[in-house]
UniProtKB/Swiss-Prot annotation:
O-glycosylation; glycosaminoglycan of chondroitin-sulfate type. The gene is APOO. Component of the MICOS complex, a large protein complex of the mitochondrial inner membrane that plays crucial roles in the maintenance of crista junctions, inner membrane architecture, and formation of contact sites to the outer membrane. Plays a crucial role in crista junction formation and mitochondrial function. Can promote cardiac lipotoxicity by enhancing mitochondrial respiration and fatty acid metabolism in cardiac myoblasts. Promotes cholesterol efflux from macrophage cells. Detected in HDL, LDL and VLDL. Component of the mitochondrial contact site and cristae organizing system (MICOS) complex, composed of at least MICOS10/MIC10, CHCHD3/MIC19, CHCHD6/MIC25, APOOL/MIC27, IMMT/MIC60, APOO/MIC23/MIC26 and MICOS13/MIC13. This complex was also known under the names MINOS or MitOS complex. he MICOS complex associates with mitochondrial outer membrane proteins SAMM50, MTX1 and MTX2 (together described as components of the mitochondrial outer membrane sorting assembly machinery (SAM) complex) and DNAJC11, mitochondrial inner membrane protein TMEM11 and with HSPA9. This is MICOS complex subunit MIC26. GO terms for cellular component: cytosol; endoplasmic reticulum membrane; extracellular region; extracellular space; Golgi membrane; high-density lipoprotein particle; low-density lipoprotein particle; MIB complex. Belongs to the apolipoprotein O/MICOS complex subunit Mic27 family.
Length: 198
């Protein structure tokens, strides 16, 4: 160990010594030709006479330019549609992932309840033979009844919200029908004199 330290300390201590070195002047030195910085080719500034001349477009460049101008409205429409549908798709994917996680960690008794609700929908589909209106009304109605047996509080909230929406839709429909009635049947030429007036 001592030998290793001795060998490493020796060269290290020599680096601490200082020496002065003097250069000997050349006896036959040529006369100095100093060059200015501006004269170096690296730093030369080009003349201000240059002019930009645009090259003529080739047939290929012209046709590509026309194609780009032709496709521009469609690409902007696609970009706008993509920017509008991207958040909706992300929320749909997130809803799917949340549903998958819920089904993986479902509460006890969830799948039998889901089976009963689905079976009620099938019974509604079987009873709705014939009319298309029955096929639209019976299956969701039976499924709603079965779901309300298992989830009564959620059924009450759903009934309240859907009742308000149905009332709003009915009111809007009434207003539209009233406006149409006034426009088509109560014009000045269509109004008949009542029997009491002459």
């Amino acid at each position: 160990m001592f030998k290793v330290i001795q060998r490493s300390v020796g060269p290290a201590s020599l680096s601490l010594l200082t020496f002065k070195v003097y250069a000997a002047p050349k006896k036959d030195s040529p006369p100095k030709n100093s060059v200015k910085v501006d004269e170096l080719s690296l730093y030369s500034v080009p003349e201000g006479q240059s002019k930009y001349v645009e090259e003529a477009r080739s047939q290929l460049e012209e046709s590509i330019s026309q194609l780009r101008h032709y496709c521009e409205p469609y690409t902007t429409w696609c970009q706008e549609t993509y920017s509008q549908t991207k958040p909706k798709m992300q929320s749909l994917v997130q809803w799917g992932l949340d549903s998958y996680d819920y089904l993986q960690n479902a509460p006890p008794g969830f799948f039998p309840r889901l089976g009963v609700i689905g079976f009620a929908g099938l019974i509604g589909l079987l009873l709705a033979r014939g009319s298309k209106i029955k096929k639209l009304v019976y299956p969701p109605g039976f499924m709603g009844l079965a779901a309300s047996l298992y989830y009564p509080q959620q059924a009450i909230v759903f009934a309240q919200v859907s009742g308000e929406r149905l009332y709003d839709w009915g009111l809007r429909g009434y207003i539209v029908i009233e406006d149409l009635w006034k426009e088509n049947f109560q014009k000045p030429g269509n109004v008949k004199n009542s029997p009491g007036t002459k």
